[in-house]
Curated annotation (Swiss-Prot):
Keyword field contains Transport: yes
Native organism taxonomy: Bacteria, Pseudomonadati, Pseudomonadota, Alphaproteobacteria, Rickettsiales
Primary residence: membrane
InterPro entries documented for this protein: ADP_ATP_car_bac_type
UniProt protein name: ADP,ATP carrier protein 4
Function: Provides the rickettsial cell with host ATP in exchange for rickettsial ADP. This is an obligate exchange system. This energy acquiring activity is an important component of rickettsial parasitism.
Organism: Rickettsia prowazekii (strain Madrid E)
Length: 512
């Protein structure tokens, strides 16, 4: 039997070809792009790690040291106006400073505040805040302003919450993505961005794992250096020290990207410019009212924001029954973040196959279905803790309150994971068959109105209830929130079904 050398050569070339395709699929980064990709990834990792640490810390401080009910007030009356203010400031900075210097300035302001909070403000918060007797007298004389008084009396905690909430919008969404979008070509983005998504979830998982082990780290540092500071003060200082270190690494990485990694071609693209034809709130409403397709997409965004916030408030309030200190609460949030990272990676890997095999509607309806089913389970146990919680607890031999917290955590993990993948991808797909003008302005309109109304609408609704009923708590209004939640989810599923019809019609129309 003779062996043909040309056949062997062809076989090897086919194997090499298949192996090359597999390698390109797993690692699509070209050799000359590796340094650029790795530095951008490092910058993204640092920013997201900080984001997840301060997100957990702000909730830990506010829920355990002021009250979970105040979060809705902070979101509507604190975060929203601050976001508008910083947008105005940013626009003015863009017209007066270099893009690189804007990044350094804004990051430095955030890091300076975090350093002051860790080493000056929090260790002395009892001296800086109003005395409990004064707060009690004020709330007794002005009961309808109770929650505003509590927030102002513990002003440093409120300020920390607002600053921490601004980080993802200002540093990640604005500074990071505007920089990356400017230095990345369209061809590069197709290969870079999917990997960014996977790596960002790795950051969530690691941040969560760090917070889970915060108590152990605290004990180690205390024993190693014979520190005398309070346990919870040290926990906050450990978290914010990591934040400061990663912040400095971010600044250095950004400097290296600008001065060592990027070539002149990429640097020529790097300009932060404000668009003269930015869409206003009034124009957004006009666009939504004129197009049913865009109106339905905006409805999905509004319903998501309302539904998630309606569950998060009572869930965080329930968690404070078990996790009563900032350290304990941060460890609990860390566990939740770890699972969110794992499940999001799972949905990322599964998402494209679901869309391809089962179609747009099935993929789009998964998120509202998950939110609805898990949300109803949470409210059922939370509202009827003595009945439903006791039945479940008898089977799994645990505290009924812990059952509600666990179901709430599962609800949040699955909801956020499916939102980051299936919901976001199907929402973006819904724009594709539209005419170019509607696609561009319609997306801006839906994102502006849908996102803002979803987040702020739920916060305003909850804060209004607490103003009218100052003695109310999340536990006492939970049934009311459950009814609103059910109506919101039903509307969400209906809007998804109707958008599916519009989506199919738009595809048919675009193919004519």
């Amino acid at each position: 039997m003779t062996i043909n050398a040309s056949n062997i050569e062809n076989s090897f070339s086919k194997i090499n070809s298949h192996f090359s395709k597999l390698t390109d699929y797993i690692w699509p980064i070209k050799r000359h792009e590796i340094s650029k990709f790795l530095f951008i990834t490092l910058l993204m990792f640092c920013i997201l790690f900080i984001q997840n640490l301060i997100r957990a810390l702000k909730d830990s401080i506010v829920t355990t040291m002021i009250g979970a009910e105040t979060i809705s007030f902070l979101k509507f009356w604190g975060v929203m106006p601050s976001a508008f203010l910083i947008t105005v400031i940013y626009v003015k900075l863009v017209n007066r400073m270099k893009a690189e210097n804007i990044f350094y300035l804004i990051i430095s302001i955030f890091l300076t505040f975090f350093a002051l909070f860790a080493y000056v403000i929090f260790p002395n918060h009892e001296m800086l805040h109003l005395r409990p007797v004064t707060v009690h007298n004020l709330t007794a004389s002005l009961p309808n302003l109770k929650w505003f008084i509590l927030l102002l009396s513990k002003w440093s905690f409120s300020l920390f919450y607002i600053i921490a909430e601004l980080w993802p919008n200002v540093v990640f969404a604005l500074l990071f993505w505007q920089f990356v979008n400017n230095i990345t070509t369209v061809e590069e983005s197709k290969r870079f961005y999917p990997l960014f998504g996977l790596l960002s979830q790795t950051g969530i998982y690691l941040a969560g794992h760090f917070l889970e082990n915060l108590s152990n780290i605290n004990y180690y540092v205390t024993n190693k250096f014979a520190l005398q500071s309070s346990f919870h003060t040290l926990s906050i200082q450990i978290i914010l020290t990591i934040v400061l270190i990663l912040g400095i690494v971010s600044i250095k990485t950004f400097w290296l990207l600008n001065h060592k990694v990027l070539d002149k071609k990429h640097m020529a693209l790097l300009r932060f410019k404000t668009k003269n034809k930015s869409i206003t709130i009034a124009k957004s409403f006009q666009m939504i009212l004129s197009s049913r397709h865009i109106r339905l997409i905006a409805t999905l965004l509004i319903c998501y924001g309302i539904a998630i916030n309606l569950v998060e408030g009572p869930w965080k309030a329930a968690a404070t029954k078990i996790y009563k200190t900032p350290t304990e609460y941060a460890a609990f949030i860390g566990s939740y973040l770890s699972y969110t990272g794992v499940f999001t990676i799972f949905f990322v890997l599964l998402g494209s196959n679901i869309v391809r095999r089962m179609g747009w509607f099935t993929s789009a309806v998964i998120t509202p279905s998950i939110v609805f089913i898990t949300g109803i389970l949470f409210f059922a146990v939370n509202n009827f803790e003595g009945f439903a919680g006791l039945i479940i607890a008898n089977f799994i031999l645990t505290d009924p309150a812990l059952v509600a917290i666990t179901i709430g955590a599962i609800q949040n993990v699955l909801s956020k994971s499916s939102k980051y993948t299936l919901f976001d991808s199907t929402k973006e797909m819904a724009y594709v068959p539209l005419e170019p003008e509607i696609k561009i302005s319609g997306k801006a309109a839906a994102d502006v109105i849908g996102t803002k109304l979803g987040k702020s609408g739920s916060a305003f609704l909850q804060s209004l209830i607490f103003i009218i009923l100052p003695s109310a708590s999340y536990q006492s209004i939970s049934i009311c929130l459950m009814i609103i939640f059910i109506l919101t989810c039903v509307t969400w599923i209906w809007a998804t079904k109707e958008l599916n019809k519009e989506y199919k019609n738009s595809i048919k129309f675009s193919q004519k």
